[in-house]
């Protein structure tokens, strides 16, 4: 049985990850598989918080938002993350995982507002906490929300779940000689111009000395291995 390497982690899930093989929306088999992985990690005693994106439903920078006021489009994207958070909470509930959703936008009939002390208490009680609506402000990505919430709750690491199994020297889909980094420093990533997160999120993690691990959400058991400190994905460190 794997042991946990981290006590408290922040998991960043993209909305696109929920689509599976579908063109948009939430793929049921995909979200069930994800909740299996999350439940397995929660069972280790890891205090787990999640920031989820909304790109499977709407993105403020997507072609569909062209001609729209950027702030309005971003608020629509934030509401999409709330829909995803509720879907994830429901799926986790069916796995017996006690989960709370906190939103940076107030929709009192549906979700709790984000209140840091309450979020910390939930984590200490062993509940999974899903942070929705990004930072609550337009012009900021959910990557930035993940960095911000990770710093606020005192997470030991941000786990960024993507479609690739780490950070590569080049695009592995275009360059067969591309190699995966097992570890790389923040400064090295900047020098090599590797896109780990958007610049604001990356700078916040670096300034707060909050490491990032990039791994594939599509690999079975990858989340548990990442939490257990095994050689999974790429670790970005100070």
Swiss-Prot record:
Which Cys pairs are S-S linked?
none
Q: Gene encoding this polypeptide?
A: pyrH
List the keywords (alphabetical).
Answer: ATP-binding, Cytoplasm, Kinase, Nucleotide-binding, Pyrimidine biosynthesis, Transferase
Specify the pathway. Answer: Pyrimidine metabolism; CTP biosynthesis via de novo pathway; UDP from UMP (UMPK route): step 1/1
Q: What name does UniProt use for this protein?
A: Uridylate kinase
Name the InterPro entries for this protein. Answer: AceGlu_kinase-like_sf, Asp/Glu/Uridylate_kinase, Uridylate_kinase, Uridylate_kinase_bac
- Annotated signal peptide: none
Identify the species of origin: Bordetella bronchiseptica (strain ATCC BAA-588 / NCTC 13252 / RB50)
The reactions it catalyses are: UMP + ATP = UDP + ADP
Q: Which domain of life is it from?
A: Bacteria
Q: Where is it located?
A: Cytoplasm
User: Which SUPFAM superfamilies has this protein been placed in?
Assistant: Carbamate kinase-like (SSF53633)
Q: According to its UniProt entry, what is the function of this protein?
A: Catalyzes the reversible phosphorylation of UMP to UDP.
Top enzyme class: transferase
Cited NCBIfam families:
pyrH_bact
Q: How does it assemble?
A: Homohexamer.
């Amino acid at each position: 049985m794997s042991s946990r390497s981290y006590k408290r982690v922040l998991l960043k899930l993209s909305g696109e990850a929920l689509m599976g093989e579908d063109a948009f929306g939430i793929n049921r088999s995909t979200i069930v598989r994800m909740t299996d992985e999350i439940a397995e990690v929660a069972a280790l005693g890891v205090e787990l918080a999640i920031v989820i994106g909304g790109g499977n439903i709407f993105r403020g920078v997507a072609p569909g938002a062209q001609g729209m006021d950027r702030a309005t489009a971003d608020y629509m994207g934030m509401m999409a993350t709330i829909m995803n958070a509720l879907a994830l909470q429901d799926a986790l509930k069916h796995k017996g995982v006690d989960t709370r959703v906190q939103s940076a936008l107030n929709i009192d009939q549906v979700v709790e507002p984000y209140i840091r002390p309450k979020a910390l208490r939930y984590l200490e009680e062993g509940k999974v906490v899903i942070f929705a609506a990004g930072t609550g402000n337009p012009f900021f990505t959910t990557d930035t929300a993940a960095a911000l919430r990770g710093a606020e709750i005192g997470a030991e690491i941000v786990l960024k779940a993507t479609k690739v199994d780490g950070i590569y020297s080049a695009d592995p889909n275009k360059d067969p000689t591309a190699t995966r980094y097992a570890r790389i420093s923040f400064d090295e990533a900047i020098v090599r111009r590797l896109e780990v997160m958007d610049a604001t999120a990356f700078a916040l993690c670096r300034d707060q000395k909050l490491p990032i691990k990039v791994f594939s959400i599509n690999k079975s058991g990858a989340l548990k291995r990442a939490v257990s400190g095994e050689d999974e994905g790429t670790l970005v460190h100070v």
